A protein has these predicted regions:
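Short, acidic/turn-prone active-site loops that include or flank metal/cofactor-
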Residues: 5-9, 74, 134-135
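Extracytoplasmic/secreted cell-surface and envelope-processing proteins
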Residues: 10-13, 56-59, 121
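C-terminal cap of metal-dependent C-N hydrolases
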Residues: 84-86, 106-149
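Short, solvent-exposed cationic patches
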Residues: 152-158
C-alpha cells in the first residue's frame, strides 16, 4: 500500500504527479486494496512489505504498512502484526527460523514503550533493537521530515 498511496492520494503539488498519473495511481491503490480484501475473504495469504525505491517510502516505515493494512483492508492490529512477522516469514520460506519468538528461532526483535496491539504508531519510536544477539539501545534513524508530514496525513494513528 505504501508505494501506491502517494501517487493515488497525495496532492499533485506534493507528489509532483500529473492529474493523469494521480488518476492511474488511485486505480492501482484501489486495486491493491480490493485484491487484498478479496484474498483475505478467500483465505489466500497476503504478505506485506514496502518498496523503498518508490517516492515517499522509507526504510524505516514498515509500521505504516501495518497501519495502512488495518485502515484500508479492515484487519486488526494483531493480524497486521502477525502478517508483517510470522506470515511474511512463512511466505518467504523462513518461518521455521524467524518471524516469531520461539525456542530455536532467531530472536531478532524491537522494543517499544507502548503496545502495538493497541496503537501501531508506537512502532515508529523504537527503544531497542536486538539483532543476532546484539542489543542496540535507542537506535537513531535519520528520518525525512517532509515525508513524515505527508505520510502522517493518511495513517489512522498519529
Amino acid at each position: 500500500l505504501c508505494p501506491a498511496l502517494p501517487y493515488g492520494l497525495f496532492d499533485c503539488q506534493v507528489s509532483h504527479a500529473t492529474k493523469e498519473q494521480k488518476a492511474n495511481g488511485k486505480v492501482v491503490f484501489d486495486g491493491v486494496i480490493e485484491m487484498a480484501k478479496e484474498n483475505l475473504a478467500q483465505g489466500v495469504p497476503v504478505g506485506l512489505g514496502t518498496d523503498t525505491a518508490c517516492p515517499f517510502v522509507t526504510q524505516y516505515d514498515m509500521w505504516r504498512e501495518l497501519d495502512f493494512y488495518g485502515k484500508y483492508c479492515g484487519v486488526s492490529n494483531a493480524f497486521a502484526l502477525y502478517t508483517g512477522t510470522l506470515l511474511n516469514a512463512t511466505l518467504a520460506g523462513v518461518g521455521d527460523v524467524t518471524g516469531s519468538i520461539e525456542v530455536g528461532k532467531c530472536a531478532d526483535m524491537i522494543v517499544t514503550k507502548g503496545n502495538p496491539l493497541e496503537d501501531l504508531s508506537v512502532l515508529r519510536h523504537v527503544e531497542m533493537v536486538v539483532k543476532d544477539g546484539v542489543i542496540y539501545d535507542h537506535p537513531q534513524v535519520k528520518k525525512i521530515p517532509e515525508v513524515e508530514v505527508e505520510m502522517d496525513k493518511f495513517n489512522r494513528v498519529k
